[in-house]
């Protein structure tokens, strides 16, 4: 007989988890549809395929462990992982890339550690990082952001399905992201670079399309803060640290500049990472002070990887995984002592008690 393995209180623990997970899914909707507006229906195909794959792999793993499948699937944690994988991978990427990422996230990064609540690393970011290292070409084929109302600029639904399931190239639609452009043109003054690159020139504050995607995920994150799904400490400290690092090394656009603070805040996966990845309660820190340190170090690492790191343009996934590894260490030194417990007395301390 399949037995339930949940901690007390048993009355509403599972229901609360499923409610919070659904709130996270709802909060991704503004960013998801903004991405669809600028990148086409490939975003929705990604999310749908990754979500179904994650739920299927979750069900298979739970069944193999002889647990009640329906009960554990209804916590919707696998659905959240699928949505995050779907919006993290490039639209129009091959179908097998999404299924491989779902397998890595659910089976290797989650269920092998014991399931939800036991995984030390964020499953979606483990999948993203392994796919990026293993398939760098497929993982960097981002479509150029063009509004859907511009005819012929993005593939339609049928073309999208053909590209996803046949592996047809998207050379006519793909190109470098804003972070790629900045990183690969270090010798140019930013003013000249903005004039030469339409992706930068068409942007209002950062880069065309991506700035609105980040604003949409920001609104989703603020909604989660309003609903008290998590506290402000980790996301805000990450954004402040990233902006501070960018401000320290920004010199008004010389050839050695790597973008303004606003550019880094509204480009790439910044807001998605801050409000939907860094805030993962399982793989992050638990103390308030620890969350501030955890988020700030992630923000600093994101800037370091973006600016001086390897050929990978965005550093959110690698920064998060590095700090997942360091989270227990941070908690060890920042978690307050239990009320009533004091530091152990030294053996040499012979202070008399009660006057004796």
UniProtKB/Swiss-Prot annotation:
Record keywords, A-Z: Cell inner membrane, Cell membrane, Electron transport, Flavoprotein, FMN, Membrane, Phosphoprotein, Translocase, Transmembrane, Transmembrane helix, Transport
GO CC terms, sorted: plasma membrane
Membrane topology note: Multi-pass membrane protein
Chain segments annotated as transmembrane: 20-40, 42-62, 68-88, 117-137, 205-225, 229-249, 259-279, 292-312, 315-335
EC number(s) from the headed UniProt entry: 7.-.-.-
Predominant location: membrane
Cofactor: FMN
Listed InterPro entries: NqrB/RnfD (IPR004338), RnfD_bac (IPR011303)
Positions carrying FMN phosphoryl threonine: 177
Keyword Transport: yes
Signal peptide limits: none
NCBIfam families membership: PRK00816.1, rnfD
Function: Part of a membrane-bound complex that couples electron transfer with translocation of ions across the membrane.
Family: Belongs to the NqrB/RnfD family.
Protein name: Ion-translocating oxidoreductase complex subunit D
Source species: Cellvibrio japonicus (strain Ueda107)
Lineage summary: Bacteria, Pseudomonadati, Pseudomonadota, Gammaproteobacteria, Cellvibrionales
Gene assigned in the entry: rnfD
